[in-house]
């Protein structure tokens, strides 16, 4: 494998889907929030992305079979919105800047092909003392201010590293609208509590009230076993 490769499982029928990213990172906040959305919407995996930029290991499943690291794309429909949800095993090494740009471009091309023009990225924000605060950055000041009343605080004068920041920035250059939700975390272990706060803020912002009640002790940190 010398370049990113998409494996399409089926082609979902989606209309103007919202693209939601939640990958590994600080406290795995984004990943847990994304998997909460997958569970809440009963989303189905429809594509996988493999790339030579991912770390050099394989994941071993419960049945003893192995596979390389991957990203997975899930499709979901609710009465309010259609979604493409991205989550995955890992990210390219932080020092490999070219790999991050390349894979983020591939992801945005893929989402654009399916009709996406609005993106939500989710991740963690390092804080010495966490208070379940959720911060927002956006592609425009107007958009950021619009969602302050939905439970988020403005994130200013900082950086958003990895795919969570880069996807939003590159999407803006394509003319998309979008936001980033950041949950405060110490960065140690899986932060289920703040991930749940990010998920609830996302639902408030998108006005998509899901019936499912997710307790922070039950926030999914792994893919459903039937989809490994």
Residue spans for each PLM region:
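Short coil/turn connectors at secondary-structure junctions
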Residues: 14-17, 43, 80-82, 114-117, ...
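Hydrophobic/aromatic beta-strand patches that form the interior of the parallel beta-sheet core
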Residues: 47, 84-86, 118-120, 177-182
